Amino acid sequence: MTKFIFVTGGVVSSLGKGITAASLGRLLKDRGLKVTIQKFDPYLNVDPGTMSPYQHGEVFVTDDGAETDLDLGHYERFIDINLNKYSNVTAGKVYSHVLKKERRGDYLGGTVQVIPHITNEIKERLLLAGESTNADVVITEIGGTTGDIESLPFIEAIRQIRSDLGRENVMYVHCTLLPYIKAAGEMKTKPTQHSVKELRGLGIQPDLIVVRTEYEMTQDLKDKIALFCDINKESVIECRDASSLYEIPLQLSAQDMDDIVIKRLDLDAKYETQLDEWQYLLDTVNSLDGTITIGLVGKYVSLQDAYLSVVESLKHAGYPLKKDVVVKWIDSGEVNDNNVEDYLKDVDGILVPGGFGFRASEGKIAAIKYARENNVPYFGICLGMQLATVEFARNVLGLEGAHSAELNPSTPYPIIDLLPEQKDIEDLGGTLRLGLYPCKIKENTLAHQIYDAVNIEERHRHRYEFNNEFREQLEANGMVFSGTSPDGRLVEMVEIPENDFYIACQFHPEFLSRPNRPQPIFKSFVEAAYKHQNK
């Protein structure tokens, strides 16, 4: 029987519910349990795919092509699992599906209501997360804060699921804040008490309370929270502010959180707590010596969460070198051919990540040109690959006005264009090439050296492709098409052997990097940047 753990939050947002859920997932996985994890988002968008990065941050893509919340990236990296489309459920997706059923007549003319129709749809998606993965445990984070109007159907659904499945199969974890009042010189439990009171008013009694705090809690404070919130003293878990996110699983384990959960749900743990690998990772992070600077040239740099997985992947790649990879954030809207050297002269490597739209594209092209001409290690992702071919066409082939048809529909040289089957599609949502696709790598190339394989799979999120009408011209002038779809039709990777390190890919390798297992291209790129630094 699959067990379900629900993680809610109170008092304020940004308490770290996602990191708490991911850390618990890691602890349970290390005890030999099969874990999956899920995020409920109360917003009415069907998914974040068409939301502005300034609103939402990064869109994280799963193997099966779901466009999801960036928290799923934390989940995958912490627990080291690959999630699926059932791991991110939005209110928009739930309501949309219920309304489609109503239009089809599935409800036989009945009145469609939040209870039971919306709550039943939510519960169905809860169960699908477990069924689709055959998990021992499903951990579900409820977005928002207890008492938010938009979260109420989700709270009601997880209340009902306890009766549906039995108390022994369901557990509630509530994250709260323990603020420190400087004038009084003490921490206050009242916000936690009121948050739990609000949750209990909605029919949920938490089994565990995870308290976010700046300072170490006294036993008296824990006892007080336990008394007023009606839980066991050992079920009050302190989560202190940490210099590294990787400390959190160790903090929770030190307070036996995994043991409490295993006992409460009667789980069959195969191993005792074993966090040696995680401790080694944390020791590595805390002993980094020296830095490697990567210039990230993008249009959304004012909200760094827009590139969260890219930055995490760069950090992962620095760990084997015992180096801290520092990102220099460069707004491509500010860059041009005249000032590009001012922005990039002190970086060890240049990365142009994915993106959409014409704005600030010329600044990215200027950065790519600088990298190519000055032999600075270059790594392009998605749009960063597309613009690499555009820059090469303009400045090596001399095709003046060459561009992507997405960014300039009237370009005389559409180096990047839509596939014929995409040209009649008008909707933006869910119409990209999404998810895990195979790539065939050409032997005796940098790509082959990096992966040490001919056949790989990586995650994608794009609509436009390299236009094969220009492939021969670019190849004749020194660009190598080192990765393609298995049928050779779609370009997946390009490189310039003349440079020390110049590679770009159509896919998004950042979605498969792990703290203890850096993604191969990122690892090679950071190594090349380190060599460049020491030239």
From Swiss-Prot:
InterPro entries named among the record's database cross-references: Class_I_gatase-like (IPR029062), CTP_synthase (IPR004468), CTP_synthase_N (IPR017456), GATASE (IPR017926), GATase1_CTP_Synthase (IPR033828), P-loop_NTPase (IPR027417)
Enzyme Commission numbers on file: 6.3.4.2
Positions of L-glutamine binding: 54, 355, 383-386, 406, 463
Reaction it catalyzes: UTP + L-glutamine + ATP + H2O = CTP + L-glutamate + ADP + phosphate + 2 H(+); L-glutamine + H2O = L-glutamate + NH4(+); UTP + NH4(+) + ATP = CTP + ADP + phosphate + 2 H(+)
Glutamine amidotransferase type-1 domain sequence ranges: 293-535
Keywords for this protein: ATP-binding, Glutamine amidotransferase, Ligase, Magnesium, Metal-binding, Nucleotide-binding, Pyrimidine biosynthesis
Sites where the protein binds ATP: 14-19, 71, 240-242
Active site: 382 (nucleophile), 508, 510
Pathways per UniProt: Pyrimidine metabolism; CTP biosynthesis via de novo pathway; CTP from UDP: step 2/2
Protein family membership: Belongs to the CTP synthase family.
Additional observations: CTPSs have evolved a hybrid strategy for distinguishing between UTP and CTP. The overlapping regions of the product feedback inhibitory and substrate sites recognize a common feature in both compounds, the triphosphate moiety. To differentiate isosteric substrate and product pyrimidine rings, an additional pocket far from the expected kinase/ligase catalytic site, specifically recognizes the cytosine and ribose portions of the product inhibitor.
Function: Catalyzes the ATP-dependent amination of UTP to CTP with either L-glutamine or ammonia as the source of nitrogen. Regulates intracellular CTP levels through interactions with the four ribonucleotide triphosphates.
The protein, known as: CTP synthase
Lineage: Bacteria, Bacillati, Bacillota, Bacilli, Bacillales
Underlying gene: pyrG
